[in-house]
Amino acid sequence: MSDRTTLRRKPDRAIDNCQAIHALIDEAVYCHVGVMAGDGTDAHPVVIPMLHARHGDRLLLHGSPASRLLRTARDGMDLCVTITLLDALVLARSGLHHSMNYRSVVVMGRATEITDHDEKVEALDRFVEHAIPGRTVRIRPATTQEVKGTLVLSVPLDDCSMKARTGPPIDDETDMDSDTWAGLIPLHQGVGIPIPDEATGDATVPGHVAFWSRGRR
C-alpha cells in the first residue's frame, strides 16, 4: 500500500489483509482496467472490463496485441485495476442513508509483459482455471500461434487496498421511530442451467460445468 492507495474516506472500512485481498480477486470473475490513453490534449481515460487471474502476488491480464489499453499498459503507463463484489442493497429510512454492502479492491501499478513461451502458457491456463476451475485438463492445449497472438501482462499486487461495508443501515436517531421498512436485500450471482451447442448435443454435462459456482460457499 502507498499514499495513493491509502483510504481516506471511511478508513475504518479498510481491510489490510493480503489473504482477504487475494480471496476477493479469486472470487471475482472479472475486473475493470483503467489507463490514460493518448498524448497531450488528446489524452483521455479508458476503462475496460477484463477477465483476470492471479499468480501469487501478481495480477494477470491478457488480450489481443491490438488492444490499445493493453499496449498502453505494456509501454509503461500506470494503470488502475478495480474489482468490486456487491453483497447487499442497504435500505435505510432516508434516501441519504441508503447504501450497499460491498467488497472492493483497487490495484495501482505498472505492468510488465510476459514473453517467455512457457510462462505465457501457464498464465493462459490460469485464465481458464480462474473462470472455470477444472477446465484446462478437458480442452486441447493452446497452439504456438495462439500463444504468440496473445498479449499477457503481469501487475504486482504491491500497491493495492481493500474496502468493505457490512451490516445494517445506519439511520439518524430522529428517523428510528419511522414505520418505513429498513434492512438488507442480499445480492448474489445467479447461475443458470448450462446450454450445450449443436455439436455437443445431448452429451452429459461434465461436473466442472454442472457444479460451477462463484462466491462464498
Outline where the language-model segments fall.
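Short, structured beta-strand-loop surface elements
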Residues: 65-126
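A generic structural signal for short beta-strands and their flanking turns/coil linkers
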Residues: 29, 48, 55-57, 75-79, ...
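C-terminal edge-of-domain segments
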Residues: 1-3, 115, 119-217
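An N-terminal domain-cap segment
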Residues: 2-61, 71
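Short, structured patches in soluble enzyme cores that scaffold and shape functional sites
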Residues: 35-37, 63, 83-85, 111-113, ...
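Catalytic micro-motifs at enzyme active sites that drive phosphoryl/nucleotidyl and oxygen chemistry
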Residues: 35-42, 69, 92-97, 140-142
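Short hydrophobic-aromatic micro-motifs
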Residues: 59-62, 81, 105-107, 153-154, ...
